[in-house]
Design a protein with these regions (language model features):
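Active-site neighborhood of divalent metal-dependent phosphoester bond hydrolases
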Residues: 30, 47-130, 146, 153, ...
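Active-site-proximal beta-strand elements of phosphoester/diester hydrolases
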Residues: 2-10, 130-136, 228-230
Length: 251
């Protein structure tokens, strides 16, 4: 089978469709599957269209991202916090509930649209030779700090039973910096890890010894040793990262 894997389209459905088309995706080919690595809606102007497009695909699997958690958290809370405004989450809720005048009206209206879309999302997809996650698999935290937002300079251990990690552990794993965690040797799955979450341009710039997002910025997938990064900073670049792999589902 051929898998078309993307991440972090953030409501830029046109860029997503263009990227899949350029990669050769054929919706009528039963050997073609689409796998999303999370963060589908907020920041872009077309969350409704993104939901409709992804929901229409007959063969797709959607991995949950940290921004997908954020929008559900805000709706459950009933009002936005500061990060909901800066991340575009609050605007996305309003886009999905255009007739609402208050957050009290907007949140339940948006939930009716988002809940069917998010309820089928999974924490990871495991193929015979690849594992697709939003950021990383759950790891054992050794310093007692449960937050995975900052991973540099911290110690972790590979968690052999990561497949059976708790909902809380998976939610935390969606925040880690995947390139840093890969550099710590924490992908001991024996398979190539494919992730989004963290813009590949940061790693390209680090490798090339330059300032990130300068005139040499690269918005494309990053192929490392045992891992592939997909996040092309779509809200900035207008590009969605897609890789095409040939693999099979686990038996």
């Amino acid at each position: 089978m051929k898998f078309f894997i993307f991440s972090d389209c953030h409501g830029f459905v046109g860029a997503l469709e263009d990227a899949l088309d350029k990669a050769g995706f054929d919706v009528n080919n039963e050997e073609h599957w689409v796998i999303g690595a999370g963060d589908y809606l907020d920041r872009g102007a077309y969350p409704w269209s993104t939901i409709r497009y992804l929901s229409s695909l007959p063969r797709k699997i959607l991995v949950k991202g940290n921004h997908d958690d954020l929008i559900l958290d805000m709706i459950k809370r009933g009002y936005p916090l500061g990060h909901d405004h800066s991340n575009g989450t609050a605007m996305t809720v309003m886009d999905l509930a255009p007739n609402a005048m208050t957050w009290e009206e907007a949140c339940p209206a948006a939930l009716k649209i988002i809940k069917p879309f998010t309820k089928t999302m999974v924490d990871y997809v495991e193929l015979k030779n690849h594992i697709i996650v939003h950021s990383f698999i759950p790891v054992k935290i050794l310093d007692g700090n449960e937050s995975m937002y900052h991973t540099e300079g911290r110690e972790f251990e590979y968690m052999p039973n990561w497949r059976n990690a708790s909902t809380k552990e998976w939610k935390g794993a969606r925040w880690g910096k995947p390139f840093d965690l890969c550099s710590k040797g924490l992908n001991q799955t024996g398979k190539t890890l494919i992730f989004g979450h963290y813009a590949t341009e940061h790693q390209f710039a680090k490798d090339e010894g330059r300032r990130d997002f300068d005139y040499k910025a690269r918005f494309e997938p990053y192929f490392g040793d045992g891992f592939i990064g997909l996040d092309c900073a779509t809200a900035y670049s207008g590009k969605v990262g897609v890789v095409v792999i040939e693999d099979d589902f686990m038996e």
